[in-house]
Amino acid sequence: MIRRVVVAALIGSILGLSAQAEVIYVNSENGLNLRLKPTENSASIQVLEFGQKLAVIDDDPDLGGWYRIEGGGYVDGKYVQKTDPFSEMEFLGEWRITAYAETGYPCANGNYPTVGYTIACNSLDFGTEVYIEGIGFRTVEDRGPAYLGDAWCDLYLGEFNACVAWGDQTKKVWRVKE
């Protein structure tokens, strides 16, 4: 362990990196483009996931709010934060995630379901907001079959074919703290 720290410090000093790089986290639900240059018109190298931890090499004011990231590339400062967004949430575990389509009826809470917003869940109160890994933020508005248990939610996708394509998946789920 000590050898790794010493080697990392030596490599960092050779490359001009500080031993204690500033850390930031992706705070964009739909991911964040890591760009070749500090501009929105620059090519995207890859898409970073919500909550991904990044080490900052440079946050010079001349970059106009962009950060140069260890490993190469730039991220727009509008879509990052200095605290881990998952520290502001309660991890509920790995849940079974199924999907449902339009029925023509309102949800159990009286609202009509909305794609990208509504989930059905029996173990959480109406209005509870959750973050589902790889999906994003959703809100409990409906209920589903009791036999599916507590570690389950049903994503409203609207179209039957989208639900069939989704199938039955397992994802990590966090409850957003109030």
Language-model regions, residue ranges each:
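Short, solvent-exposed loop/turn positions at domain surfaces
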Residues: 39-42, 118-119
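Surface-exposed loop/edge segments in extracytoplasmic proteins
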Residues: 41-44, 137-139
